[in-house]
């Protein structure tokens, strides 16, 4: 069988035919383990610079509310790290869920030359099991872990992003 939805009277044929089936992704109330249930994406196009040797907030953040306590959150993204003209300057980038650092070890990038505004995209990922249906906020923080120059996340019209995917457990 099928369900037919007829469009209003206009020029041409405008009929949409849908199969009469159950259990599709659109109507299933018990998704299979591994199904993607929702996606949150945040594109960050700004700049935060520091010489700090302890974590500072980059501005790259996104929040997702899991629909089940058995869900996992797949976090992927990339932070564009920019280094000033200082030899051996490095950056440590950490992924946090609230105040808890999820990435151990953290992600690192660095330069050993004194060029101006060296840049490096630093990809990151984590599969987190929050075991909660409360809103989960993921934040990228960073600091200068080596050298004497400043480090920045974003600059020179570069983009950074974070994407959160709820995966059914």
Residue ranges and their predicted role:
Residues 1-3, 13-17, 23-24, 38-40, ...:
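Short Gly/Ser/Thr-biased coil->beta-strand turn/linker motifs
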Residues 43, 49, 54, 65-169:
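Terminal beta-strand-rich extracellular "head" domains
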Residues 16-47, 169:
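Glycine-rich, low-complexity segments
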Residues 9-11:
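Surface-exposed, glycine- and small/polar-enriched segments that build interaction surfaces at terminal
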Residues 5-7:
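Self-processing/autoproteolytic domain segments and adjacent N-terminal interaction modules in large
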Residues 55-61:
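A short beta-strand-loop element at or near the start of a globular domain
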């Amino acid at each position: 069988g099928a369900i037919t939805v007829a469009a209003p009277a206009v020029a041409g044929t405008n009929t949409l035919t849908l199969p009469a089936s159950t259990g599709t992704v659109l109507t299933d109330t018990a998704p299979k383990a591994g199904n993607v249930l929702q996606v949150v994406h945040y594109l960050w196009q700004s700049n935060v610079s520091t010489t700090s040797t302890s974590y500072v907030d980059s501005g790259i953040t996104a929040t997702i509310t899991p629909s089940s306590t058995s869900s996992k959150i797949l976090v992927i993204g990339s932070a564009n790290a920019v280094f000033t003209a200082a030899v051996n300057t490095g950056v440590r980038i950490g992924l946090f869920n609230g105040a808890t650092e999820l990435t151990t070890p953290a992600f690192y990038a660095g330069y050993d030359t004194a060029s101006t505004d060296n840049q490096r995209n630093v990809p990151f990922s984590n599969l987190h099991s929050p075991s909660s249906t409360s809103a989960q906020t993921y934040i990228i923080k960073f600091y200068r872990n080596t050298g004497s120059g400043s480090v920045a996340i974003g600059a020179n019209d570069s983009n950074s992003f974070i994407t959160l995917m709820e995966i059914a457990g």
